[in-house]
Amino acid sequence: LKSSIKSDLILGILSDRIMSTKIMQKGRNNKNDQVEYLETPIKSEYDKKEYRAIRLPNGLEALLISDEDSKTCSSQHQDMKNEMKAACCLCVRTGTFKEPPGFSGISCFFEYLLMTEFEKHCLKYDIVKLTYKHGGSFKYLFDYDEYTLSFVIDIQEKHFLSVLIHFAEFFTNPFPEKEAFMQNRSNIKGEFQTALTLAKNRVPQPQLSSFTRTDHPINQIIEDRIIKEYENLDYTKLYEELHKFKKRHYSARRIKLVIQARLPLNTLEQYVTIDTCFVNIPTNKLSPDDSTKLIKNNVPFDSAAFHKMYKISSSKHVGQLKIAWVMPPLYALYKSKPYKYISWLIGNEEKGSLMSYLRKKMWNVSVSNEEICYNVHTTAYSLLKIDIDFSIEGKRHVKEVLDTIFSYINMLKQKGPQKNIYDDFSKTAENSFRYSEEKDPRDNVSNLCIHLYQYPSRDYLTGSKIYFEYDPKTITNILNYLTPETANIMIFDKNFDYLELDKVNSWSRVSYTDSEISQEWLEHWKSIEPLPDFHLPKNVNPYLGVQYFLEPLPAKVPKYPVKLYNDSISELWYRPDPKFRLPISHIYTHFISSVGLQSPENAALMTVYCNIIKLLVVEELYSVVAGGHSYDISVSEKGIITKISGSMPIVLLLNIIKYMIYPNVKKEMFETIRDQQVDIYSDIITEPEKLAEDVRLWIQKLVHYTYVDMHNALRNVSFEEFQNFAKCFTNRLYIQHLIQGNITQDAAIESMQQCFEALKCDSLHSSMMQPNRVFQIPLGTSYYKLKNINKCDPTSIVIDTYQIDITSIELSVLMKLIIMIMEKQLSLKFQSIQNDLIQHTSCNYTDVDGILTYSISVIQSLPNKSYTTELIKEWIDRFLEYFKDFLDELSENDLDDVKERLRIFKQHADMNIEEEINRNWNEIIKCQYIFDRYEREILALNNIKLNELREWFDKYTWNENYVKKLSIHVIGSDSAEAQSIALEYIIDEHQHKNIEENYIIKVEEYQKKLFVYPVTEG
């Protein structure tokens, strides 16, 4: 560092430790008397943070968040995990789509300049290096709906002010000098193209945006004339226009700021108001809102193109129906949120709902956490959207599905607004807000910064969450927007006739066709009566009236989960929550069975079984979830995992178990879900990255069924075979429980007993438990080459994997350090590539059932017959040679920086109880039970020396007596060959040239010669 920069950093650190330094006093005396204090945001009773909203003299509005209480909690309850990062988000709303004549797209270029100049500024003041060393990061975020660009930075608290000063300094004058700009004019055209691409990628609802009026600003960005305007560009004129644009649209009155740290509010205010910080951002007296008025007469989508039906090619087998209605911006209605009331009713999944009927007819059999009906709000317009996945049966009944949707909407119109339903919905939102878990500071500040544009200061926290007032008139008004003739209808499917799709979308480049919606259909949808199956939610949700209370803590709370019970059928781990103290408990359960590992048919049936359970419980548990509970059901290698949270999680668990034992499903429903899962497997194996990773695990593991195996096996599985599978699954089980949170030890034991009594299962015989085992890759290099299953995809990928040894704390920490160093160098090497040989690189280390490996992946996705996977492999080898030299030149100080970043990560305080639970759960399901793993890793980290890294890398990457390398090649193709779902092995000339290397032709034959590592699970 230069001496002046070093002085700034030292000054910053001292200022952070001593709250009354001269620089702070000066800023306080000069600026504080002009700071305007806004109304304090309303917060939840369980939120221990303190908030202050202020407006600086230049008009910039800031939200200050003091999290001092978490420092006390961390020191009391988690001695080791007490690191916390401070975070800052500055959000800029420039004049997006307010281009002057002759300079279309200049707003995009201006935002791009802000980003590139910020990067230069960070490099100049070593902010990148400083944030990296001290566990921090910086990134950009585009808000698609608010047309804003956010700059987010976080770092260890003791270094926060030193970085914040330099961070703020950039925004006082972010524009490059004319001389520097003109020197770079040879790159301007390319940079403008990059800026335009970024802007197109982040325009909200790109498919819909191409349907706006041709004279609407949103539509202008897709015009070819933008590029033409810049072909013979006068760069002096461009600079002048950019300068004018900055003067008009870059103003402190259009900038918002949020900072969060474990420091007093007064200190945070000093940080923001000192002379060197945000008070010097330029301002003007022009309205901060006029450049965001992108609509005329509130009708941006009035073109005939919007009100049509579109058939669009999809890359996925699962079809989808999307319906959208456009409305004027609805932010002003945030207190009553009528749009959310309507979207909640349309997306309701209880009996009598739209989704219940579609599932009954088997037109939809998907269950996910994604909303079925949702709202999109921008400064230009609002949308109400319905997204429904089609089953194979649903694709055959598109018209009937549309009839059903409009029938349900007509019922909502006939019934009108219902205050009791609104009140239930409001209580649900209040509970969710009251008991919401903490977010990471970086995520929190970036989310809240957008709220500063949308709500008055008192509602910064509550504006998007709480329902303040019931307004039946606005509900009726929005329902009246939902008419057939104003709807935009899109149908996505992979199996459309490509000859029928005669157009290409200018945004996404996908094929589509459009058609007018027949007048007969429109009239039918207007008058269709509600189906007799439909009714509104009938009763008040009983789970909303549950009284929440905190259980008393025992005199001594264990630092980690303790085992309360263990026998041949189950084990129970338990820990109360002394830190977060929310009236919520969590039950995680792993139902382990041997049946899923017995064949590819059973492995696939495990997923089908899980999907059927999710479908069966969704209606019954919907009201419980609305009452504040959450649940997740997923498949593991050994069985099924449930994760349940709420005030009474055992209620949900017992319901799930009921359907596990008796999955009362008809043959037609099973076949529909089975066929959909076959399609999902088909989509997965046509993605070359997933195919390569799947094959890599297949070769390494003693038992692993590939997606190809499961795809081919599942197609022929009968309903009777499924019934036998379901019965066998619950006959013999081993069950792992972890219970944490607001629950007593006795209640935890009782919950486990209720679970066992409901299942009435026998224990797994030891001979039936197949522990995960791994093959030892032979010395040298083993190659496996296969064709990309998607014959129209030119993407090729190479994954080179180096198998190391049985896992240990010391070895895993050393490898993590290596990968952290390698990631950065791999990224730099990738950026320096001058050709299009490679489009993506990554490196990783993996614990494959107790055996550690590290790997490098490289993707080539452009059609070029001269580029082979052998060239990619050679590039990887050259990189590893370079990396060896880099390690040899690495200094101890450089290593200390990486170690410090890893230490901060390991010691970062948990933001919510789920972070702790997930860490403990990972130990339990792996049967390792090292709950103090992070503490042990810190001890190991402190003892690792630079020479150990060098020796380790040389030994396992270059020493022929230790190198065990597996090289997977997936070869892309641009041919139009007929496709079949099978692994197609490739024999090429390299196998004959390198006879000393091991080319795998038949995996089973190759594995017969290999040693199998011993069991590594606890």
Indicate residue ranges for each PLM-predicted region.
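Non-catalytic accessory/assembly modules
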Residues: 179-186, 193, 200-201, 205-209, ...
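M16/insulysin-pitrilysin zinc metalloprotease superfamily fold
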Residues: 116-121, 152-187, 268, 348-350, ...
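Extracytoplasmic
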Residues: 49-51, 57, 83-87, 146-148, ...
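M16/MPP (pitrilysin/insulinase) zinc-metallopeptidase core fold and M16-derived inactive scaffolds
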Residues: 72-156, 162-163, 220-226, 348-368, ...
